[in-house]
Design a protein with these regions (language model features):
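A long amphipathic alpha-helix within ATP-dependent nucleotide-binding catalytic cores
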Residues: 196-227
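Generic recognition of stable, solvent-exposed alpha-helical segments in well-folded globular domains
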Residues: 53, 57, 199, 203-210, ...
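Active-site loop/lid in soluble adenylation, ligation, and acyl-transfer enzymes
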Residues: 2-139, 148-178, 285-291, 295-316
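Acidic, low-complexity intrinsically disordered tails
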Residues: 144-145
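Conserved metal-phosphate-binding beta-hairpin within the catalytic cores
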Residues: 120, 226-246
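A short mid-domain helix/strand-loop element embedded in enzyme catalytic domains
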Residues: 166-198
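C-terminal helix-cap and adjacent tail motif
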Residues: 138, 246-307
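Coil-to-beta-strand transition motifs
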Residues: 113-115, 223-226, 237-241, 252
Length: 316
């Protein structure tokens, strides 16, 4: 059964995003990853069973693996502790919430989030590939030796990359956060420094690249390529910490080492079945989204569970 909405009486829900419902607990937040799925920035009416659990359990796994690189916002994800905390806040009949909250919920520190998405790419794909192609097409051809380098948001890249190619070094390509229903806008590191200040921008860039390096080395040992991913950071007092989700199929492109072949798009462990089906019915990319057929739901749920199994090494 998919859980697509939550309602906890006696608590103030401060955010209902594409996937997560967030409740205000005073100094802390209660974050529930539902089974909602969005495609083309539209939330679908059908949920994907276990999706929220996969996102939460994978984030917990990565929080633990990367905590020596950067602190994170987690206080607890233990269901008994969460229910006890809710009871202490006057929420009635907390046991009835166990099934809804179990495995998909965290209590976290409340951080002031930076208004940027920290994107790191080890391979060229998605919006970066589209931008790279446009820039390359506008370059004058050079004599004899093909085109020169392409400068993407201030980063010089070779002029002969193909789609899904591994980049010489991972690159940091931040984006501005969009309102619900809009697309994030890619920006340069210099523009990010203007928005949040140079010192913080430097920390965010360093932490992003360091977490990616550690995570991609681990993932490679499990036969998974992390092509790109995005992180969000926040500040608690003087400390900069990682918040939201980390290295999940919703925030990252995971590819299978076995099937990786540059020169086109790669199959990934995410909502590709949903996107493909929507394109096949000529979905107009405007809300409301259509109900998803059972096979699309089942295949997508399997992909999310497989991502967890491949990375963590056990079943969800």
């Amino acid at each position: 059964l998919a859980i697509t909405s939550t309602d906890i009486r006696g608590l103030r829900r401060c955010i209902s995003g594409k996937v997560r419902d967030v409740y205000d607990l005073g100094d802390e937040l209660l974050i529930i990853a539902t089974d909602r799925i969005s495609a083309f920035d539209v939330i679908m009416p059908t949920g994907i069973p276990d999706k929220g659990r996969v996102l939460t359990q994978l984030s917990l796994f990565w929080f633990d693996l990367t905590k020596d690189v950067v602190e994170n916002h987690l206080i607890t994800a233990d269901t008994d502790e969460i229910l006890a905390r809710l009871a202490s806040l006057g929420v009635e009949d907390v046991e009835s919430l166990r099934e809804v909250l179990d495995g998909r919920t965290m209590i976290t520190r409340k951080a002031k989030s930076f208004p940027v998405e920290c994107v790191v790419r080890g391979y060229i794909s998605g919006s970066a590939w589209s931008e790279y192609n446009e820039l390359k097409a506008s370059l004058p051809p050079r004599g004899g030796e093909g085109r020169g380098g392409v400068v993407l948001h201030g980063i010089e890249l070779p002029g002969d990359l193909v789609e899904s190619d591994k980049l010489p070094e991972p690159i940091f390509t931040p984006a501005t956060k969009a309102e619900l229903g809009d697309h994030d806008m890619n920006i340069s590191s210099a523009r990010m420094a203007e928005i949040i200040g140079e010192a913080d921008a430097k920390v965010l860039q360093e932490k992003t690249l360091a977490v990616y390096k550690k995570a991609s080395e681990y993932a490679a040992s499990r036969g998974i390529i992390i092509a790109d991913t995005k992180f969000e950071f926040g500040r608690v007092g003087d400390e900069i910490i990682i918040i939201d989700e980390v290295l999940t199929p919703d925030s990252s492109r995971f590819w299978d080492v076995e099937t990786y072949k540059p020169g086109g798009p790669q199959p990934s462990f995410d909502k590709q079945y949903v996107r493909d089906w929507l394109l096949s019915i000529n979905f107009n990319k405007q809300p409301p989204g259509p109900e998803l057929p059972d096979d699309v739901v089942r295949n997508t749920a399997d992909k999310y569970r497989e991502a967890y199994r491949r990375i963590v090494g056990r079943e969800l």
